[in-house]
C-alpha cells in the first residue's frame, strides 16, 4: 500500500511538473521576425510541426519543431540559440562559423555537425559520431568559466 501511494504521488508530481515546464503553443506567425526569416532561409522545404514559447532564464524563448525532426530554439529577439538537424542530416552550414567548420573538417574527417548551440564565449557542437566540442568562434577550446554558482575560491 505504501509503494502504491508513493507511486501515485510521484505520478502526480511528474504530471504537474510537466505541465508547469511545458511551453505554450503559438502560431508560427507569432515568432519574432528574425526567427521567421531564419526558418524561411535555412529550412525552406521543411514544414513547421510545432511552435512553443517559454519564459526561460533570460526572458522569452521559442522552440520550433519541424516535421523532418529538426529543431531550432530562439531567443526573445529571434536570434537562433540552438539548432538540431534532422536524423541523418547536418545543420545548415551557413550558420556554423567558418573557423569551426574548418576545424571539424580537418580534425574529424567524415563527421558532420548535427547540433550547434550558442554559449557564452562560443559554441557547443555535436558531431555525427556523438562527439561534443566546446569552441570559441575562432575554433579554440573554450575555457571553463571561473567563479560559477556553487564554486568557492
Task: Report residues per predicted region.
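Disordered, low-complexity segments in secreted/periplasmic proteins that are enriched in proline
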Residues: 145-153
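Conserved histidines in hydrophobic membrane contexts and catalytic metal-binding motifs
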Residues: 61-65, 123-126, 130-132
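N-terminal, post-signal-peptide region of Sec/Tat-exported proteins
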Residues: 46-82
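Bacterial N-terminal signal peptides
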Residues: 7-17
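Residue-level detector of conserved, function-critical positions
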Residues: 115-116
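A short, surface-exposed beta-strand/turn
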Residues: 70-84, 132-145
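Boundary at the C-terminal end of the N-terminal hydrophobic targeting segment
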Residues: 18-22
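Short, non-transmembrane alpha-helical segments in secretory-pathway proteins
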Residues: 26-48, 91-112
Amino acid at each position: 500500500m505504501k509503494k502504491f501511494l508513493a507511486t501515485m504521488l510521484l505520478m502526480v508530481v511528474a504530471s504537474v511538473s510537466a505541465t508547469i515546464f511545458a511551453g505554450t503553443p503559438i502560431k508560427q506567425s507569432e515568432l519574432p521576425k528574425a526567427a521567421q526569416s531564419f526558418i524561411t532561409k535555412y529550412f525552406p522545404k521543411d514544414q513547421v510541426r510545432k511552435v512553443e514559447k517559454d519564459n526561460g532564464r533570460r526572458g522569452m524563448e521559442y522552440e520550433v519543431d519541424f516535421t523532418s525532426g529538426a529543431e531550432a530554439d530562439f531567443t526573445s529577439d529571434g536570434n537562433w540559440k540552438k539548432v538540431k538537424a534532422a536524423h541523418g542530416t547536418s545543420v545548415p552550414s551557413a550558420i556554423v562559423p567558418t573557423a569551426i567548420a574548418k576545424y571539424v573538417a580537418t580534425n574529424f574527417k567524415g563527421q558532420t555537425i548535427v547540433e550547434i548551440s550558442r554559449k557564452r564565449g562560443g559554441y557547443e557542437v555535436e558531431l555525427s559520431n556523438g562527439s561534443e566540442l566546446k569552441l570559441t568562434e575562432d575554433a579554440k577550446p573554450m575555457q571553463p568559466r571561473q567563479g560559477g554558482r556553487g564554486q568557492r575560491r
